[in-house]
């Protein structure tokens, strides 16, 4: 019998896995995958978080796992870095070996790199992520000595490559980034669904919590976090000063900055938050977090008819199917 037989897979999925560990993470290196909708502020939050952690004496590696390759831009003052995939291809064509000095760069104690991805229309982004991690392993990823490895993942895409850390237990915990809007919470809910799915398949990854970015005080993100059973690790306000500094590639997560306390709190919570098993919402549950005036959730579905589809009156024709009497 094939290991991919549907009956076998259903049988495996029906077994209740062990509970998610809820104690402190004890592995020497914490590998944390951060997911969120494009534009939700993942890269902004991670650049400042990683900088604050480094200033607190932690060894931090930040890896951009988004084909846009913009995770490290804020950290390096807007400068783009050579991606692992692009550099690997160039080195291979030249008959050379890729070295860590070709793709990893540092600022004030933070080490950072970009996996990259194919050009638009020229390949699979998820496959690019897998290739990138294969290259990291060849460069000695499992032998490096970091306290934290932060993985910045795009959450909009359902491709399995972007779910690699969850599917293969490559990280100990997941953090979602969202705001008080339906689309970012939809993505956060999907990430929770992915975690729950792989838990049922025997995985061990849990969700440590949510970073609430651009918080305008309306409360939907807090309600979502409470509903799915995860904590809010930090609430970054919707503030014009933060927006301007982020747009100008300025780090605000410095110990002497106006916003230092935000990222000190976030660094502490990210380090200590245990991985939890979330309870994802269905579509109606997600919509109910918002006023029906905003989402249109009070609309009742009206089925279409054949007459509607033809734009004219429709008369049901007798069937030509031959029905035989039972013998």
Cite the ranges covered by each PLM segment:
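Nucleotide-state-sensitive switch-loop elements of NTP-binding domains
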Residues: 18, 28-32, 55-59, 65-153, ...
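Helical mechanochemical/support elements of P-loop NTPase systems and associated helical scaffolds
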Residues: 67, 125-128, 132, 158, ...
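Conserved catalytic-core segment of NTP-binding enzymes
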Residues: 55, 138-148, 153-238, 243-244
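Extreme N-terminal, non-catalytic leader segments
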Residues: 1-40, 44-61, 68, 94-98
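A short beta-loop-alpha structural element at the N-terminal edge
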Residues: 301-314
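C-terminal lobe/tail of nucleotide-utilizing enzymes
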Residues: 1-26, 197-300
């Amino acid at each position: 019998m094939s290991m991919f037989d549907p009956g076998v897979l259903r049988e495996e999925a029906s077994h209740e896995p062990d509970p998610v560990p809820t104690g402190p993470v004890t592995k020497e290196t914490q590998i944390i995958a951060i997911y969120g909708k494009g534009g939700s502020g993942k890269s902004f939050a991670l650049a400042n978080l990683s900088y604050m952690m480094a200033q607190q004496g932690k060894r931090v590696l930040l890896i951009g796992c988004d084909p846009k390759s913009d995770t490290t831009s804020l950290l390096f003052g807007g400068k783009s870095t050579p991606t692992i995939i692009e550099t690997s291809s160039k080195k291979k064509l030249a008959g050379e070996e890729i070295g860590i000095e070709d793709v990893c760069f540092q600022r004030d104690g933070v080490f950072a790199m970009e996996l990259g991805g194919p050009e638009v229309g020229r390949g699979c982004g998820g496959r690019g992520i897998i290739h990138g991690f294969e290259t990291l392993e060849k460069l000695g990823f499992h032998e490096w000595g970091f306290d934290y490895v932060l993985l910045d993942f795009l959450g909009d895409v359902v491709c399995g490559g972007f779910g690699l850390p969850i599917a293969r237990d490559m990280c100990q915990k997941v953090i979602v980034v969202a705001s008080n809007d339906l689309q970012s919470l939809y993505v956060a809910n999907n990430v929770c669904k992915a975690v729950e799915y792989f838990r049922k398949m025997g995985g061990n990854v849990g969700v440590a919590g949510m970073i609430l970015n651009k918080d305008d005080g309306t409360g939907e993100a807090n309600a979502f976090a409470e509903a799915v059973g995860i904590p809010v690790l930090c609430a970054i306000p919707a503030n014009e000063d933060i927006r301007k500094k982020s747009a100008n590639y300025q780090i605000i997560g410095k110990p002497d900055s106006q916003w230092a306390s935000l990222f000190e709190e976030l660094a502490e919570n990210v380090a200590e938050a245990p991985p939890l098993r979330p309870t994802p919402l269905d579509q109606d549950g997600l919509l109910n977090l918002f006023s029906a005036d905003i989402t249109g959730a009070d609309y009742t579905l009206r089925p279409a008819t054949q007459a509607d589809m033809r734009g004219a009156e429709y008369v049901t024709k007798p069937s030509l199917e031959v029905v035989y009497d039972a013998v």
